[in-house]
Amino acid sequence: MSVILFRKQRDTEEELGYAESHCHTVKYRTECPPGSLVYGRYSVMPYYRELDEELRIRGSRLINTYGQHKYIADFDYYYDVAEYTFESWFDLSMTRYNGPFIVKGQTNSRKHLWSTAMYAEDKRRAVEIARDLRNDGLIGDQRPVFRKYEPLKTLEIGVNGVPFANEWRLFYLGTKRISQ
């Protein structure tokens, strides 16, 4: 049986309604029936590892194990897709490229503060942004990631200079595209 473990929040009520109308949805981990495949929605952080272990003890499992989550969240997947995505560095001394850059944490960014906390015209500014992100409550413990800025086709410019672009994400299982 598949179950969505959904932590209800004020800004996710509409999504919860859709989930409840299409899937078996629970609000508490203790409501997950034994033998369930559990999709965590707003419910796994900050105790992902503990949830993974607890569900396993109860005979269920998360759709993504804690290890799989860490592989994505810690940006460890980069080396597996490096030839297909924008060049990235964890240490700017490892590149002669001088900018522009996108600066973010391994997992999170401050995209809504594009012009002051994400986009850097050059290395000097990228280092400054990374230093400032160290004091950020959400990103401070994450390793900084410096990505080569590649301008995409901009559809419009939003608040704080955030470009809305024609960006596509494709998902594959092996060699078969399963979603876009």
Q: Predicted segments — roles?
A:
Residues 36-37:
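Structural motif
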Residues 169:
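Short, surface-exposed charged micro-motifs
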